[in-house]
Amino acid sequence: IDALPKIIENHPDIKVLVAGPGDPDEIMKDVDPILHPRITFLGLLSEDEKRQFFKSIDLYIAPNTGGESFGIILAEAMATGVAILASDLSAFRNVLEDGKWGELFSTSDSVDLARRASALLADPLRRQSLASQSSEGAKRFDWPVVAEQIMDVYDLVSGNGEKVVLASGNRAWSKLIRGRGE
């Protein structure tokens, strides 16, 4: 919310849609009243509404400041092929592969958020490129891919009584190795 005045100043025709939980009156009390007509609260969305929402926007911004263990909302946005700008939470960095599938801004830094959002909104070719990249990145989360990874883990842990250790601090399944220590 703190980044909105600068974003709107840079893009005076922008319409801001806010989806998710929260009391609009509580959120808007700290927003300059002159900006109120530019902001629409949609509340919680059904799965179909969420897909329509993502397909209707030029840029999805995920300004989360914590509490994300995976970042499923980013995977959902990626599947619709929308350009993404997200806070650099660990979960979001992992889903976006450190910026490969979308751009990141410093968590809780409204100046960085406003700067990066304004730059993306001013650059339709960059947004189009990010949208294509995010759509490609979403394929990692398709059910056949995930099911294959799950089967690989089952095969790995049930094989020959050998020990299994994790080779990565990020606990990705693809980093599991067989037969080394504890």
Describe each PLM feature range.
Residues L59, A83-A86:
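Short hydrophobic beta-strand element within catalytic cores of glycosyltransferases
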Residues L44-L45, Q52-I57, I72:
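Short alpha-helical donor nucleotide-sugar binding micro-motif in glycosyltransferases
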Residues D112, R126-R140, D152:
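A short, well-ordered alpha-helix in the C-terminal region of glycosyltransferases
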Residues I27-D48:
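Nucleotide-activated donor-binding/catalytic signature segment of Leloir-type glycosyltransferases, i.e.
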Residues D98-G99, E103-S110, A119-P124:
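Conserved acidic donor-binding segment of nucleotide-sugar-dependent glycosyltransferases
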Residues W143-G181:
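C-terminal alpha-helical cap of glycosyltransferases
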Residues I1-D2, K15-M28:
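Glycosyltransferase donor-sugar binding loop
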Residues R51, L74-A79, S90-N94:
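Short alpha-helical segment that forms part of, or immediately flanks, the ligand-binding pocket
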